[in-house]
Swiss-Prot record:
Binding site for Ca(2+) 3: 103, 105, 107, 109, 114
Gene Ontology terms: biological process: calcineurin-mediated signaling; cellular response to pheromone; conjugation with cellular fusion; intracellular monoatomic ion homeostasis
Note: This protein has four functional calcium-binding sites.
The protein's name in its UniProt record: Calcineurin subunit B
Subunit structure: Composed of a catalytic subunit (A) and a regulatory subunit (B).
Protein family per UniProt: Belongs to the calcineurin regulatory subunit family.
Protein's organism: Neurospora crassa (strain ATCC 24698 / 74-OR23-1A / CBS 708.71 / DSM 1257 / FGSC 987)
SMART domains, A to Z: EFh
Residue ranges occupied by any EF-hand domain in the UniProt entry: 21-56, 60-88, 90-125, 131-166
Length: 174
C-alpha cells in the first residue's frame, strides 16, 4: 500500500467524494489499520477500532465495505465505503449505503428475514423475537407498496424520506 502510484490514487479520487489530500489521509489511516501489512483490512483489524467494535451493526458495515465478498477490504473498497459518509456525498449515496445494511444477500430487496436479522442485531435481547417479528411484519406491510413481500430501494427511499439521512450519515473529518 505504501507504493500506491499516483495514477491509482487519482483513479480512487475520481471514483469517490474525496479530494487528493483526503484520500492521502485515508491511505495513512488504512495503513495503520492494516496491522499485518497485507494490503487489506481483515474483519479482526476492523473490529480493533473502538468505534466499530461497539457498533451492533459492525459485521454488516464490514460486509458492505467488502464489495467483492473476498472477506477483507482493500484500499479502494475502504475509500468507496467511506465515500458515502463524506459531506460531499449526496442523499442517494447515503440511502444506498443504509439500504445495503439491510440487504444482506445483495439481491436489491430487503426481505422479512433480512429486516428481522438486522433489527435483532440492533435490539439484541431487549425485545422478544415474537415482538420483533410483529414490528418487522408491520414495517414490511407499510413499506411494501407493490405488495411483493419485500422492500425495494425505491420503497425504502419512500419509507425514510421524512428522516434526515444525509445529516445522520455524514462525517465531517476524514
Amino acid at each position: 500500500m505504501g507504493n500506491t502510484t499516483s495514477s491509482v490514487l487519482d483513479n480512487i479520487v475520481q471514483g469517490s467524494n474525496f479530494d487528493r489530500e483526503e484520500v492521502d489521509r485515508l491511505r495513512k489511516r488504512f495503513m495503520k489499520l492494516d496491522k499485518d501489512n497485507s494490503g487489506t483490512i481483515e474483519r479482526e483489524e476492523f473490529l480493533s477500532l473502538p468505534q466499530i467494535s461497539t457498533n451492533p451493526l459492525a459485521t454488516r458495515m464490514i460486509a458492505i465495505f467488502d464489495e467483492d465478498g473476498g472477506g477483507d477490504v482493500d484500499f479502494q473498497e475502504f475509500v468507496s465505503g467511506l465515500s458515502a459518509f463524506s459531506s460531499k456525498g449526496n442523499k442517494e449515496q447515503k440511502l444506498r449505503f443504509a439500504f445495503k445494511v439491510y440487504d444482506i444477500d445483495r439481491d436489491g430487496y430487503i426481505s422479512n428475514g433480512e429486516l428481522f436479522i438486522v433489527l435483532k442485531m440492533m435490539v439484541g435481547s431487549n425485545l422478544k423475537d415474537q415482538q420483533l417479528q410483529q414490528i418487522v411484519d408491520k414495517t414490511i406491510m407499510e413499506a411494501d407498496l407493490d405488495k411483493d413481500g419485500k422492500i425495494s430501494f425505491e420503497e425504502f427511499t419512500k419509507m425514510v424520506e421524512n428522516t434526515d439521512v444525509s445529516m445522520s450519515m455524514t462525517l465531517d473529518q476524514f
